[in-house]
From Swiss-Prot:
HAMAP family: PyrE. It catalyses: orotidine 5'-phosphate + diphosphate = orotate + 5-phospho-alpha-D-ribose 1-diphosphate. InterPro entries: OPRT, Orotate_PRibTrfase_bac, PRibTrfase_dom, PRTase-like. Disulfide bonds: none annotated. Its cofactor is Mg(2+). This is Orotate phosphoribosyltransferase. 5-phospho-alpha-D-ribose 1-diphosphate binds at E117, D118, I119, V120, T121, T122, G123, L124, S125. Pathway: Pyrimidine metabolism; UMP biosynthesis via de novo pathway; UMP from orotate: step 1/2. It comes from the Bacteria. Coiled coil: none annotated. The gene is pyrE. One of its GO terms (molecular function) is magnesium ion binding. GO terms for biological process: 'de novo' UMP biosynthetic process; pyrimidine nucleobase biosynthetic process. The keyword Membrane does not apply. It comes from Parvibaculum lavamentivorans (strain DS-1 / DSM 13023 / NCIMB 13966).
Length: 194
């Protein structure tokens, strides 16, 4: 699946939103990718994650023992990608502000893992997830996401495989363009939800 088809899936789902958004990273953007609208359709999610699984297989040499994703946003694409790769799907979740592996997931030393995310902006959640995986002794052989909205600038600490790599502007709160600052800000992301 090429980049244009990936973005078309988001457009068909009504998931390519325009306005003024505060992203989970704290940055502000005129575009928000509301992946929940994509993930509510199992067929659409399946198409995207099957394509991601195929791309991971092409780019990662050697066996893959598991897919691990950060909660909340990475759980669905991680699970679906793992299903197509026929490996276990696990996730890390926040406990006292840090990602940890819980629920008895059997991630152990020496396992070869791909970390799967939904959307990457700054790479912070990916880096935190990879750090949590590393604490188990497992080896992260790659990271993957549906869309890298940093245009390839995000650093996650390992190779980042994406179905689409686009540069969507994101601004620090004190560096907003006038036209964006004039719009009311919405915060549709999932980080810090109480």
């Amino acid at each position: 699946m090429d980049q244009e088809k990936v973005l078309k899936e988001f457009e068909k789902a009504g998931a390519l939103l325009r306005g003024h958004f505060i992203l989970s990273s704290g940055l502000h953007s005129p575009v928000f990718l509301q992946k929940a609208l994509v993930f509510m359709n199992p067929q659409r999610t399946g198409r995207l994650c099957k394509a991601l699984a195929e791309k991971i297989r092409q780019e990662v040499k050697g066996p893959i023992d598991a897919i691990v994703s950060p909660a909340v946003g990475g759980i669905i694409p991680g699970y679906e990608t793992a299903r197509y790769m026929k490996v276990p799907a696990m996730y890390v979740e926040r406990e006292q502000g840090e990602f940890v592996l819980r629920r008895g997931f059997p991630l152990t030393k020496g396992m070869r893992v791909v970390m799967v995310e939904d959307i990457v902006t700054t790479g912070l959640s990916s880096r935190e997830c990879i750090e949590a995986i590393g604490k188990t002794g497992a080896k992260v052989v790659a990271a993957a996401c549906l869309i890298d909205r940093s245009g390839g600038k995000a650093k996650v600490g390992t190779k980042l495989i994406s179905l689409a790599r686009i540069a969507i502007p994101a601004y620090a709160p004190d560096k907003l363009p006038k036209e964006l600052a004039a719009l009311p800000a919405e915060k549709p992301g999932s980080r810090h939800i109480a």
